[in-house]
């Protein structure tokens, strides 16, 4: 039997002001499922973000605490604690914390494995919204964070 304890899983810190703990289905994670991946993310207040990106896997974000702005394709909405959003494969999406408290979120995607946008963000090579072939963000959306802001 494998039991994963979130408190003991290493944190990945990303430039867009968030940290992630993968639990299932990713390289080096305690539960080696292949069919799906799952983990938790905390977005810092006032703009912490999972920046505009797409991926081959279908995915769900479940908001556990806080409130933010979710963009999926050409749509933009507020999302809050207790709500989940489906992210279809290859569709660009972005989640931004618009609140003054941390936003806690669980992600689940299938199949499992690491996704390219993590490495792109860490390497500073994440495609920029609106620069071909990457589509523009929906009108009025929070700007995409492609590097850690200087505060």
Regions found by a protein language model. Name each.
Residues 98, 108-115:
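C-terminal structural segments of small proteins and small subunits
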Residues 47, 60, 67-69, 76, ...:
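Structural motif
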Residues 74-89:
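Short acidic-glycine-tyrosine-enriched beta hairpin
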Residues 35, 40-45, 54-70, 108-110:
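Short, conserved beta-strand element in jelly-roll/cupin
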Residues 1-35, 51, 117-151:
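A short, N-terminal "cap"/entry segment at the start of jelly-roll beta-barrel domains
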Residues 19, 56-57, 75, 91-92, ...:
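A generic "binding-loop/recognition-motif" signal
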Residues 50-52, 70-71, 87, 93-100:
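Short beta-strand His + acidic residue motifs that chelate non-heme Fe in jelly-roll/DSBH
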């Amino acid at each position: 039997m494998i039991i994963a304890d979130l408190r003991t899983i290493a944190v990945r810190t990303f430039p867009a002001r968030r940290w992630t703990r993968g639990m299932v289905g990713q390289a080096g994670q305690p539960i080696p499922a292949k069919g799906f991946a799952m983990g938790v993310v905390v977005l810092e207040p006032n703009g912490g973000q999972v920046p505009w990106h797409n991926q081959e896997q279908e995915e769900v974000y479940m908001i556990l605490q806080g409130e933010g702005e979710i963009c999926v394709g050409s749509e933009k909405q507020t999302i809050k604690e207790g709500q989940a959003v489906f992210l279809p494969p290859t569709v660009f999406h972005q989640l931004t914390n618009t609140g003054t408290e941390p936003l806690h979120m669980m992600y689940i995607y299938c199949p499992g494995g690491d996704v390219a946008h993590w490495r792109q963000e860490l390497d500073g090579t994440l495609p920029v919204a609106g620069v071909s072939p990457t589509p523009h963000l929906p009108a009025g959306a929070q700007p995409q964070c492609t590097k850690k802001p200087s505060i």
